[in-house]
Design a protein with these regions (language model features):
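A short His-aromatic
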Residues: 121-122
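Conserved class I S-adenosyl-L-methionine
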Residues: 1-43, 57-61, 78-81, 89, 144-166, ...
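A conserved beta-strand element that flanks and buttresses the S-adenosyl-L-methionine
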Residues: 115
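Short alpha-helix
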Residues: 173-188
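A short glycine-rich, Lys/Arg-flanked "PGG" loop and its adjoining helix->strand segment in the class I
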Residues: 127-139
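Class I SAM-dependent methyltransferase SAM/SAH-binding core
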Residues: 49-51, 55-103
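Conserved Class I S-adenosyl-L-methionine
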Residues: 55, 192-260
Length: 260
């Protein structure tokens, strides 16, 4: 039997977990949305393309303060949720459609800002996708990526890569910060600003935002138990206000497409 490729794994996984992902506290976090909106320097006249928009929450947030927000995602269920949420919110200046990030269904130079938020760790065709983001962006428009990034310590990073793949089978790999910086430079996009922040993620909340088999759940619990006995790994976990959290670095970058 032919094994599904990464793209099909991502599509099927997000179709299965669309409602869970949409309801996740991180997806709904208005403080995170406001921070990223301001980081991207969005303004009333902007037209936004959100590549791999998920359930459309950030598009809907932005649409209240810009000209128009467009979201595209590989998952049918995610797009259905995005349309439903926009309608229920009474936000008319949004458009959502199913599409593939490696071949975006838009004309060249259609949007003033093109972003990919919390999605690059599901990709493998980084250069193709970034080229498509750049193609769809105005000349002198902005291009932004926001995503989790690799840990500096190899032992720690190896642990969390295995952890992420057990949590969600659609996880490919968290890119390094240097890889993302190189991506901008190799595609001749000027870097305007960058920021790396460490956030504390609620472990139980994080585990519940994705779906997995009972077998994988047991494996994940055993894997975490082993990791928490490691003198290095355990430092990335902590109890806070009766909940268990783990540390994850997030990198945000904003660039500008050249005028020619």
């Amino acid at each position: 039997m032919k094994q599904p490729n990464l793209k099909e794994i991502v599509r099927l996984q997000f179709n299965r977990q669309a409602q869970k992902f949409s309801s996740w506290s991180v997806t709904k976090n208005q403080e995170y949305a406001d921070y990223y909106f301001n980081f991207c320097e969005m303004a009333p006249g902007d037209t936004l393309l959100d590549v791999s928009c998920g359930s459309g929450d950030f598009c809907i947030f932005c649409a209240q303060n810009i000209g128009h927000a467009t979201g595209v995602d590989l998952s049918d269920k995610m797009i259905d949720l995005a349309k439903q949420q926009a309608m229920e919110s009474g936000i008319a200046n949004t458009t959502f459609r199913r599409g593939d990030a490696v071949s975006l269904p838009y004309e060249a130079e259609t949007f003033s800002i093109v972003i990919s938020k919390s999605a690059f760790h599901h990709y493998s065709d980084y250069h193709t996708i970034f080229s498509e983001m750049k193609r769809c962006c105005y000349r002198q428009g902005r291009i932004s990526i926001q995503d989790i990034v690799a840990y500096d310590d190899k032992e720690v990073n190896d642990f969390f890569e295995s952890f992420e793949q057990l949590v969600d089978t659609s996880h490919k790999v968290a890119c390094s910060k240097s890889f993302i910086l190189d991506l901008y430079q190799q595609h001749n996009v000027d870097i305007l600003s960058t920021m790396e922040i460490t956030i504390d993620l609620n472990l139980n909340d994080y585990l519940n935002h994705a779906v997995r088999s009972d077998k994988d759940t047991v494996h994940l619990e055993q894997f975490l138990e082993t990791g928490l006995k490691d003198d290095v790994i355990k430092n990335y976990f902590q109890y806070k206000e009766k909940d268990f959290f783990f540390k994850r670095n997030v990198f945000v970058i904003l660039g500008q497409k050249k005028s020619r």
